[in-house]
Amino acid sequence: MTNTLESVMVESSSIYSAEYNSVDNTMLLYFNNESIYRYHKVPLFYWRGLFDASSKGKFINKFIVKKFSFEKLS
């Protein structure tokens, strides 16, 4: 069975954890202000790009927040 959910702790002033589900291409971002957002239909290369980015917050604002539909979970 293939692992479809990847969860990673993140060193960032914006987020502390992130998850990616490769079955439905959803990305969960856990923000330091205790908000949790689920972004829909995020291609895998954005998930990988997040970890290559020198600033996670800038990457999220530029490539995730304005491009993908989302829901606030908390």
Predicted regions and their residues:
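Acidic/histidine-enriched, beta-strand-rich ligand/metal-binding domains
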Residues: 1-10, 14-74
